[in-house]
């Protein structure tokens, strides 16, 4: 008989519209100018999971210009807590890679501003600027370099190939 590995976690998310420019009177408008609050949290009950806890909250301004109803602007705060054993592993991996081996903070914070710009054909450009506090080497554990607090900028370009090639409805 083989072993069966099971992990358990809980994830909760929610969104609440705080304000609509039309006061909710324009029911036929599928994209009203609105401000929404969103949040989510997750907890891993299994102590072997590297990310033990993650929680975020943000505000989203949707359809700020009715001429571009699919655009949005947002701000978000994210808090992530690593498992204590995993932070020790990261420090040990840093040491054997020639780094200081100093302990990493279990808590990481990200402060973010973001946007979503809808382009023709269902394509979307999503720029983001983040400020990172207490970064760790989660994605590159065997490095001698230590991450520093600071800014990050980037973007995602979403291209719906199926739609553009006519394989999926637009």
Predicted segments, located by residue:
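Residues on the lipid-exposed face of transmembrane beta-strands in outer-membrane beta-barrel proteins
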Residues: 12-16, 57-61, 75, 113-119, ...
């Amino acid at each position: 008989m083989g072993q069966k590995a099971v992990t358990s976690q809980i994830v909760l998310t929610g969104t609440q519209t705080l304000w609509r420019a039309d006061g909710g009177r324009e029911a036929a408008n599928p994209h009203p100018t609105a401000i929404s609050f969103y949040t989510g949290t997750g907890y891993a009950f299994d102590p072997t999971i590297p990310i033990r806890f993650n929680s975020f909250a943000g505000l989203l301004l949707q359809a700020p210009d009715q001429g571009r109803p699919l655009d949005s602007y947002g701000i978000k705060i994210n808090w992530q807590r690593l498992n204590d054993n995993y932070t020790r592993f990261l420090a040990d991996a840093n040491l054997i890679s020639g780094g200081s081996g100093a302990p990493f903070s279990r808590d990481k914070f990200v402060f973010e501003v973001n946007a979503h710009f809808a382009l023709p054909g269902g394509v979307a450009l999503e720029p983001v600027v983040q400020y990172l506090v207490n970064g760790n080497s989660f994605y590159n554990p065997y490095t001698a370099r230590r991450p520093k607090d600071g800014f990050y900028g980037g973007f995602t370009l979403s291209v719906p190939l199926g739609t553009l090639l006519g394989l999926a409805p637009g």
